[in-house]
Amino acid sequence: MSSIYLGVNIDHIATLRNARGTKYPDPVHAAEIAERAGADGITIHLREDRRHILDRDVRILRETIQTRMNLEMAVTEEMVEIALKTKPEFVCLVPEKREELTTEGGLDVVGQLDKVKAATQKLTEAGIKVSLFIDADRQQIEAAKQCGAPFIELHTGHYADAETEEEQQAELKKIAAGASYADDLGIIVNAGHGLTYHNVAPIAALPEIYELNIGHSIIGRAVFDGLEKSVAEMKALMIAARK
């Protein structure tokens, strides 16, 4: 079975810091600990409203991350320019609404194909690997292929939010089918959103999944168990699911 990688999202370290307008806890320190514990990459979402990660964080993390930076961002001119200036290893294009608590669904690539394609091409030309955060829908996967994105990240939020075992299994089947279809098209498949220590194994077991991006559940557990232990435990669960 192939390896699976963990990208740790540290947005909520910044959320905690910004709640009091202090300089601590610092996402830069969190990234260092996560990497030490086995994280294969660090994911941050620079939102247009700067509600958690700040421009300062992006700049410093770009210099200090030892693994790879995955910058999540909306498809806007401002964000594309920031990415071109920062040059992270990866950019994940995501939908964004100011009123949402967190990203609510996948990017509608079909509905804004030209816009997403233009951003993807511009970032790719700068040597940045682009991923599109989409639902496990064939049309969206095909549109991602049209855009020239080498990666997609399948939205696992509906799977994570399922209230019954039957609903969860139905969502898992959709994700599995989407991952298989994208793999057939030559797209590398990541996944994430709402994944926890209790629901990660079935997603991690899907052979096409290259990387999982997980944040909230890891940071939540870190409050009680410490960040290093929490990252290591998540990575261990993912690896065990592949055996």
Swiss-Prot record:
- Which is one Pfam family of this protein? PdxJ
Output the Gene Ontology terms for molecular function: pyridoxine 5'-phosphate synthase activity
Where does the record place the catalytic residues?
Answer: H45, E72, H193
GO cellular component entries: cytosol
Keywords, comma-separated and alphabetical: Cytoplasm, Pyridoxine biosynthesis, Transferase
Site (Transition state stabilizer) found at: E153
The pathway this protein participates in, as annotated, is: Cofactor biosynthesis; pyridoxine 5'-phosphate biosynthesis; pyridoxine 5'-phosphate from D-erythrose 4-phosphate: step 5/5
The record lists the catalysed reaction(s) as: 3-amino-2-oxopropyl phosphate + 1-deoxy-D-xylulose 5-phosphate = pyridoxine 5'-phosphate + phosphate + 2 H2O + H(+)
User: Where is 3-amino-2-oxopropyl phosphate annotated to bind?
Assistant: N9, R20, G194, G215, H216
Q: What is its EC number?
A: 2.6.99.2
What sections of the protein cross the membrane? none
Q: Where in the cell is it found?
A: Cytoplasm
Main site of residence? cytoplasm
Q: Which family does it belong to?
A: Belongs to the PNP synthase family.
HAMAP family, alphabetized: PdxJ
Complex and partners: Homooctamer; tetramer of dimers.
User: This chain belongs to which protein, by name?
Assistant: Pyridoxine 5'-phosphate synthase
Originating organism: Vibrio parahaemolyticus serotype O3:K6 (strain RIMD 2210633)
| Gene field | pdxJ
